[in-house]
Amino acid sequence: MSITFLIITCTSCSFEGTSLVTAGRYLWNDNGRTFQFDRRLGLCLDCNKVVAIEDLPDAETMERARSIRQTYVGQPLFSFIEPDYAKYLASQDGFDVLEQVIELNRQPVCLQCGKSAVRPINRPEGLTGETPVSLNLGHPWCSGTLQMQTSGGLRIGVRPETHVYNIHGRLISTYDE
């Protein structure tokens, strides 16, 4: 499978990262139960690089998902088809694992080192492969600002991997799909 990607650079130094770090499947596992969770692009202040970080649902979404879960019958829904994120979450196998993670009341963690010193990176409007767009995010290791652009027509072949974590965000295993 080949995909386009985003490129993150700094205006003042040679720092570079890509959105390819978010490729693959990410699972929480607890006592044999699993839940496939969402991740997003972030900057880890401990790893000093662009990484995948957990994307935890907010309290309102979780409350709605719990309510929907009580009466939901049917197969798990696909996130790219179901517009209601709470309904999507409620339909998923292993929802109890998600609830355990939320009950820990912890911050999202870096999915490389497991620490919570992360800053989410939001995709700005108007991205192209021609001119980088500012992320309005200072680069912590120099005086520069981070910027983003698309890979344009460049596509990279990725080998899908599954990453399995415990409910505290610590990596247990990684395997090829």
Q: Where are each of the predicted segments found?
A:
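Short recognition patches in nucleic-acid-associated and regulatory proteins
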Residues: L6-V97, L104-V158
